[in-house]
Design a protein with these regions (language model features):
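Generic recognition of long tandem-repeat/solenoid scaffolds
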Residues: 1, 32-38, 109-116, 124-126, ...
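Extracellular modular ligand-binding repeats in secreted and cell-surface proteins
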Residues: 1-52
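Short glycine-aromatic motifs
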Residues: 12-19, 79, 96-99, 106, ...
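Short tyrosine-centred short linear motifs in exposed loops/low-complexity segments
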Residues: 26-31, 130-132, 185-187
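Terminal, low-complexity interaction segments
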Residues: 54-87, 141-207
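Extracellular glycan-recognition surfaces and repeat-rich motifs
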Residues: 74-107
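Short beta-strands within extracellular/lumenal beta-sheet-rich domains
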Residues: 103-133, 141-142, 175-180, 197-201
Length: 207
């Protein structure tokens, strides 16, 4: 069905309807998008299927250009980033210097995610199929920040950062740094900061 006002009933020009509250899909629920044709005023509604996360495979996951979000966004099969409490995650284009990271551990990427605070507001979620190592690449420019892995977000916030198999510290630096976190068994895990904001460049999963 074409637009009744356009010549020869050309296709509608669909734009998000700013008068209605569209929602983004999550793992728990579908989202919904409301559209309107500004030429004739016709409306349509689109269901956005809920996120099916799956399990993460061995290999590299890098930051994805997601703009600025306050919801969940899938980075790769088995991996998403998400926000709570009206917090936001912001994608920033450009590359950090590799600094002292050996060439064999470097990889091509276009930008990074600014995880602007503690895990209670901004987190990475992973479904892993077994014991694995997460080689995590990131930084923080103005202070040291501790990042950890746990089976719940609350456990990150209450973490004992002396457990160096699960919690690593990015020192204050403009350069990307490489840190290693060990996961003991299959399950769902959250990555996030105990002490403040940090920049996520990527991670390499090894089973």
């Amino acid at each position: 069905e074409g637009c009744e006002i356009k010549k020869d009933y050309a296709a509608h020009t669909w734009e998000l309807d700013s008068t209605k509250a569209s929602t983004h899909p999550t793992e728990e629920a579908d989202g919904v998008a409301y559209y309107v044709c500004p030429t004739c005023g016709k409306e349509k509604t689109e269901t956005l299927p809920k996120i099916v996360l799956g399990s993460v495979s061995a290999g590299l996951i890098t930051a994805k250009n997601i703009g600025k979000i306050s919801w969940q966004e899938k980075l790769a099969e088995g991996c998403l980033v998400g926000c709570n409490n009206d917090k936001t995650i912001v994608y920033k284009s450009g590359q950090l210097s590799w600094g002292s990271i050996a060439e064999e551990n470097q990889f091509a990427y276009d930008g990074y995610l600014n995880m602007g605070g503690a895990a209670s507001g901004r987190y990475i979620k992973l479904n892993v199929t077994g014991k694995c190592t997460i080689t995590l690449f990131g930084n923080m420019t103005n202070k040291a920040v501790t990042v950890g892995a746990a089976t719940t977000i609350e456990d990150i916030n209450e973490a004992n950062s002396s457990d160096t198999t699960k919690f690593v510290t990015f020192t204050s630096s403009k350069n990307a740094q490489m840190k290693t976190i060990t996961i003991d068994e299959a399950g769902t895990y959250y990555l996030g900061s105990v002490t403040g904001g940090w920049n996520f460049v990527g991670m390499n999963i090894t089973y």
